[in-house]
Amino acid sequence: MRMAATAWAGLQGPPLPTLCPAVRTGLYCRDQAHAERWAMTSETSSGSHCARSRMLRRRAQEEDSTVLIDVSPPEAEKRGSYGSTAHASEPGGQQAAACRAGSPAKPRIADFVLVWEEDLKLDRQQDSAARDRTDMHRTWRETFLDNLRAAGLCVDQQDVQDGNTTVHYALLSASWAVLCYYAEDLRLKLPLQELPNQASNWSAGLLAWLGIPNVLLEVVPDVPPEYYSCRFRVNKLPRFLGSDNQDTFFTSTKRHQILFEILAKTPYGHEKKNLLGIHQLLAEGVLSAAFPLHDGPFKTPPEGPQAPRLNQRQVLFQHWARWGKWNKYQPLDHVRRYFGEKVALYFAWLGFYTGWLLPAAVVGTLVFLVGCFLVFSDIPTQELCGSKDSFEMCPLCLDCPFWLLSSACALAQAGRLFDHGGTVFFSLFMALWAVLLLEYWKRKSATLAYRWDCSDYEDTEERPRPQFAASAPMTAPNPITGEDEPYFPERSRARRMLAGSVVIVVMVAVVVMCLVSIILYRAIMAIVVSRSGNTLLAAWASRIASLTGSVVNLVFILILSKIYVSLAHVLTRWEMHRTQTKFEDAFTLKVFIFQFVNFYSSPVYIAFFKGRFVGYPGNYHTLFGVRNEECAAGGCLIELAQELLVIMVGKQVINNMQEVLIPKLKGWWQKFRLRSKKRKAGASAGASQGPWEDDYELVPCEGLFDEYLEMVLQFGFVTIFVAACPLAPLFALLNNWVEIRLDARKFVCEYRRPVAERAQDIGIWFHILAGLTHLAVISNAFLLAFSSDFLPRAYYRWTRAHDLRGFLNFTLARAPSSFAAAHNRTCRYRAFRDDDGHYSQTYWNLLAIRLAFVIVFEHVVFSVGRLLDLLVPDIPESVEIKVKREYYLAKQALAENEVLFGTNGTKDEQPEGSELSSHWTPFTVPKASQLQQ
């Protein structure tokens, strides 16, 4: 790209640097001598590079040899005050500006930290192979750091001696010129005009309209303003808001993104061997950690007139991450400013979903209370409990005894809590609730994407993944931007994805095998308990087998989850997805398919298959020689509710314990390990340490995938099986209130600061949620039709007795005479069959009613959902107006080329006779392979 010469008039820094690495990376040389040396090196490498090398050498001879970005300050002045630019307004701010401008005489601010440890004692004890590996790692590190310096980064190394271990900290910062170049290269959006922050919640507006005090409102200081913004261009620098202040023009998150882009694309060896980028160095153990610095400590200083101003991290802790703020709105703009759009969108989704759970939890609790009231007035339940020895039931398993139906009184009453007419209303309510939730989230997401300048991120801004760029066999023009980018043939990717799908099918088959083994376990356990000789245990044999089977199933689920996530990550890397968004979407889909089968297979079996293929006395069906399971005395719905509570609540409790304990244990171990070495080295306990040392003692950020997966699986439990457990939304709400503060505390207090990542939505998770919503409608329709007593009761009311007297006897069939003769006694079992074991006319009538109910239920819900989709716009009208206004301002601000360059000039042309001849063109940028390898 060619830059207009006059564009640099607004820069308050040194002259423009010469670039030296690949066109894909856009890194910098320190001076013209470096450029000449790289040009001479490339001349000996390959014939295709010779012309460019000679061009570089001729251009270097025509220019002076002034050092353009000096990154070699005197040793005595290397050490200084490091930290975040959150304090740029303090006295150190001018020094920070000088560093970013390239001045060697001023201390620099560290934007990023690389860490590695060297065990001197272990090095002396290593064998030759291990020593060679250590030497290779050292060479890679030195090459990587040299290439970072060549890229124009300030690299200052701080070494901390801890006994036999030396911890090395490489403190990185970028010059103003590097920041400007990469801001344009990465298509970052920067502000043109400030707007008042108009962030609001619909509940706040409703309470204000009603005149009710809003207890959810939290006054958070230093509210980030909103901006009209557009893509940054260096030749339009003066038109951007705040461009005259090099300290604050680029926020800390923008600088972190730029530095991480450089780190991700800087080679440390031969690119063809994939020796490229920070990800590989971390994976190989060459570096121990790489992270941007926090603003400072999260604990707030004592209040008083001399108290310092809170940094961004302290503001988030004080007004967001504390447990006492559980009932306050989240400061999403502050979260976005400190952690980036991706993290902020996760917390926005989590808060939005939790808020919508409140009405669902209220209605579900009311439905459950209605069930509690109906237990004592339900005539069929009263008949069952008062039947005494009137109904002797057939054995539930091969060696189980005959039993009296009256002994199942407690289970029948418990089943009535969940199985009544209110459940039908609640299922319909939850289906529409899920549709509205997603519709209004689309509006919320569009509003946040506009406010945070990432509406078109995936289409125009997102760059190819560094790992993809290093491994792609060819280049091709991007259809959106027209720029050449690394390319991997779609046909080859499709073949790899097909092979990966085979692995997914195999893993799903493993889950099904585990499910079958649990079914067999339940059947065998019921037989063992019934033979135990204990009358009390024998009476509860089926329930004990079911409960222990649920626990075993949960253990299988957790173990298989860990194995499959690692396998899915390997498969997704092999598929060569171009962008990080596509990579994450493919990885997410693989894991979710597996987790869906893993978590939902057992509830689906209980809801739709258990007790359906049992047969009848004298002709029972078997699986591997074991009689198929029957539903317990209270029916399958109460057993499904039990399974849901064990898996859903058990998983939530285990996850929350892990989220509390594991980061604390890891953080404690990291601090103990580092500080114990210092004590052995003789360092005093009260000795101060740099902020990079404090941050290295924290836990690495583990990303958002597990957090999203947990919430999406919870959404599935809340919607797909809600007919069996109206209390599921309540448990989800209570969990999420804890989850928000747990996650907030992890990010603010326990995690190293993650690199700010951009995103315009929650990605493929939204489509998964939409799929679960459609599946929930069908699932609840079949659940109400085939697993609940709602339709048999309604049929009995219409055809026999409105008060349901005699319904219990209506649902019980008599064992065939052959079975009674073989056992010298008759018995009853739950089915609509005649005395010969054939289906009765009532069964076929009910089957027709059930199928009709399924069709009507799902058509009504889908029709209403479609109508709501049409009535509720995906993008609010106010946002559409703001987008048009922003486009208009951007067009006015960036399309005045006739004034700048004359009538015939274009925005990328340079006028002749310019004071500063631009050397910033693609022709000055050699291949990345010309860096040190």
From Swiss-Prot:
Induction, per UniProt: Up-regulated by androgen.
Segments on the Extracellular side according to the record's topology features: 377-420, 521-550, 610-714, 785-843
Catalytic activity: a 1,2-diacyl-sn-glycero-3-phospho-L-serine(in) = a 1,2-diacyl-sn-glycero-3-phospho-L-serine(out); a beta-D-galactosyl-(1<->1')-N-acylsphing-4-enine(out) = a beta-D-galactosyl-(1<->1')-N-acylsphing-4-enine(in); a 1,2-diacyl-sn-glycero-3-phosphocholine(in) = a 1,2-diacyl-sn-glycero-3-phosphocholine(out)
InterPro entries: Anoct_dimer, Anoctamin, Anoctamin_TM
Tissue and organ expression note: Specifically expressed in epithelial cells of the prostate (at protein level).
Stretches assigned to the Cytoplasmic side: 1-355, 442-499, 572-588, 736-763, 865-933
Origin superkingdom: Eukaryota
Keywords associated with the record: Cell junction, Cell membrane, Cytoplasm, Endoplasmic reticulum, Glycoprotein, Lipid transport, Membrane, Transmembrane, Transmembrane helix, Transport
Residues carrying sugar: N809, N824
TM annotation in the entry: 356-376, 421-441, 500-520, 551-571, 589-609, 715-735, 764-784, 844-864
Pfam families listed in its UniProt record: Anoct_dimer, Anoctamin
Molecular function in Gene Ontology: chloride channel activity; intracellularly calcium-gated chloride channel activity; protein dimerization activity
Region (Disordered): 43-101, 902-933
GO biological process: calcium activated phospholipid scrambling; chloride transmembrane transport; monoatomic ion transmembrane transport
GO cellular component: anchoring junction; cytosol; endoplasmic reticulum; plasma membrane
Note: The term 'anoctamin' was coined because these channels are anion selective and have eight (OCT) transmembrane segments. There is some dissatisfaction in the field with the Ano nomenclature because it is not certain that all the members of this family are anion channels or have the 8-transmembrane topology.
Purpose of the protein: Has calcium-dependent phospholipid scramblase activity; scrambles phosphatidylserine, phosphatidylcholine and galactosylceramide. Does not exhibit calcium-activated chloride channel (CaCC) activity. May play a role in cell-cell interactions.
Record-stated family: Belongs to the anoctamin family.
Protein name: Anoctamin-7
Organism for this UniProt entry: Homo sapiens (Human)
The organism's taxonomic lineage, starting at the top: Eukaryota, Metazoa, Chordata, Craniata, Vertebrata
